[in-house]
Amino acid sequence: MLILLFLGIQLPLILLDIPATAPELLHMLVGERLADGYSMYRDIYDNTAPLSALVFWLLDVAAGRSFLAYRLTAMGLLLLQALLLNNILNRHNVYASKNYLPALLYLVLGSLSFEYNMLTPLLIGNTFLILSLPYIITLSREGFDNSRLFVGGFMLGLAAMCFLPLGVFLLVGIFAVIFFASNTFRSTMLMLCGFAFPYAVLLTYYLYTNTGQEFLELHLLRPWQLQVAFLRPPADVAKLMAIPAVILLLSLLSAASLPQRLVFQVKFQQLMWVWLVASLLVIFTRDEISVATFVLVLPAVAYFGEFLFTSNRKPWLLNVIFLVVLAGVLVLRYRRIIGINEFLLLDESPLLLPEQPPLAIQNKTVVVL
């Protein structure tokens, strides 16, 4: 039922209304050039992270320059992330009872905007961040389960290879070691080795192909962006993110009023606070902020949202809150079809490609600089 609800919201718009966007076209061109035999960073002068470039190359080999293929892949990744996160939370008993509320919230809020259907490096990297969770929260003992922390660091390294600023989530891993591990220093070193391992392999490859300098300049040593810059008007981003923000605020208030719980559950909640802070740090230091960047917050909103919808408030009130959220998502997502975008005043033009390409220049004198 959960998957059917998600597909019911997403598929009609993906199949019938596929606005072409500039970021996706850039990713397609990267994949197309790689499929033509060019080398990343040496022949293709672009700062797309290596693992994301690999995904775009595979998509080009499989489907060519197809916006539909990119949208379906993004939708599949979003669904996979929701199911993985819910399975991790249930398997490790982070709540008083097992349920599917986190996945439901993840998928509903992930349907808020068509930007979540754009296959971005952030969306790809977010999958590896979620995959790292069950490994970094291991209650390790000396001599036991050491490999799990290495794998957790390895997953965080793969996330950074999709989008370099995701390396900030090493903070989440370090705090997880502090909260859960018995030998903090040794466990931290093990996780850091796991994080560095994929980069060591990749750097060896680029040094072997005489592309090490370009790899360092275009990916590994890129300057950190310390100013907030919005790709879309900030007012539009605020309107679209109002629903997740309200849910997160109510959820945090509900989590603060919880009765005494197991030590593991308390530590996991503290870790998700660190996740939330790391997500906001990555989001607001990006060179181009849009709704798609807030995909990093979805795991935290889904986790804390469970406390809101299982709180001691009256059941009818909780049902009304969820129905209002669902209705708000549907209205925002289908606003163009139902003809209310002129009232909401949401401008998507900074993301979209022009419907009519500029006229070709013929029989004119041009200056090439």
Each language-model region and where it sits:
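Membrane-interface alpha helices of multi-pass inner-membrane proteins
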Residues: 147-164
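Juxtamembrane membrane-water interface segments that cap and precede transmembrane helices
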Residues: 50-61, 216-239, 251-254
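Hydrophobic/aromatic-rich transmembrane helices and adjacent perimembrane loops
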Residues: 287-320
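Extracytoplasmic catalytic/substrate-binding loops of multi-pass membrane glycan-assembly enzymes
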Residues: 15-30, 43-55
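Transmembrane-helix signature of polytopic, membrane-embedded enzymes
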Residues: 85, 89-109, 126-127
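Aromatic- and kink-enriched transmembrane "portal" helix at the membrane-lumen/periplasm boundary
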Residues: 67, 103-123, 135
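Membrane-interface transmembrane helices that cradle and orient dolichyl/undecaprenyl
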Residues: 130-148
